[in-house]
Amino acid sequence: MAEDLLKVEGLKQYYPASSGLFGKKTYVKAVDDVDFEVKKGEVFGIVGESGCGKSTLGKAICKLIEPTDGKIILDGEDIRGYDSKKMRSVRKKVQMVFQDPYASLNPRMSIHDILAEPLVIHGLAKGKQEIDEAVVRLLREVGMDDYHARRYPHEFSGGQRQRIGIARALAERPQLIIA
């Protein structure tokens, strides 16, 4: 039996709402007491209507937002208390493909630079030739051509931008992709 890659226990993400009558604080419960496990090699889906907390759940798992409560256990370690330095090693293992392809890519960077950035930051490719080859490989993995590397995000359709976001997530060869 495959071991757990990710285990989420009692995860909560509450946001303060306006104070009620007599100053009583109220909260919007975006994610409320969620439990699940993802085994290594498993594809796992969370389905729900718009606004039900799927994206918030993904951001909390990646610690892009700090959960209100619960455990996020990745490879047997609870990462909830990790500081930004410890999270760097986690981000090599876990990547997120953001929902909005228009907002998730820096408009001032070429696609080459967007895809090269995680490779350089995490030392996955060194030297211009190795970086260029890795960028081309990533573009091809998502069905795009080499020449797209020289273009900028505004030159692509929403679907193409989404594929660029996927390529960026794949750059670090993560164990878990949240999309």
Give the residues covered by each predicted segment:
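Hydrophobic anchor residue at the start of the ABC signature
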Residues: 166
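Helix-to-loop junction immediately C-terminal to a conserved catalytic motif
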Residues: 62
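The feature captures the beta-strand-to-loop junction immediately N-terminal to the Walker
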Residues: 47-48
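Conserved ABC ATPase signature
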Residues: 152-156, 160
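Conserved ABC ATPase "signature" region
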Residues: 78, 129-147
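Conserved ABC transporter NBD signature motif
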Residues: 70-78, 90
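Conserved catalytic motifs of ABC-family nucleotide-binding domains
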Residues: 173
